[in-house]
Amino acid sequence: MAKIQFSRGLDEEVIPEVRLTRSRTGDTGTATFIFTNPKILDQGTTEDITGMYLIDEEGEIITREVKGKFVNGRPEGVEAVYVMKSAQEWERFIRFMERYAQENDLGFSKS
């Protein structure tokens, strides 16, 4: 049931690239989601992007830091940043990502 939405009720089908950073103390972190040609930018979609909603059985994680990427005046992608300000937020985010990865056959690699 783990899913990502940019507009409530409209599930995003494009799987993002996710980049994680974490402080040395483990208290804070940042997740950057990069979507290439997401469904929300399709010509037929009239919904506004109101944020990025990470939804699973525990509830939802919300970020409003969402930006569109344009090439030659055409929408090409969406980049969203979620900032985790505590170890609890980090752990909650990781639980969501584990569910999302399992449902979408994704892997994790350290760089």
From Swiss-Prot:
Localization (cell): Cellular thylakoid membrane
UniProt KW keywords: Membrane, Photosynthesis, Photosystem II, Thylakoid
Entry superkingdom: Bacteria
GO CC annotations, alphabetized: photosystem II oxygen evolving complex; plasma membrane-derived thylakoid membrane
Entry's Gene Ontology BP terms: photosynthesis
Pfam families, A to Z: Psb28 (PF03912)
Membrane topology of the entry: Peripheral membrane protein
First-listed, main subcellular location of the protein, grouped into a coarse class: membrane
Quaternary structure and partners: Part of the photosystem II complex.
Family: Belongs to the Psb28 family.
Protein's name according to its UniProt entry: Photosystem II reaction center Psb28 protein
Gene symbol of the encoding locus: psb28
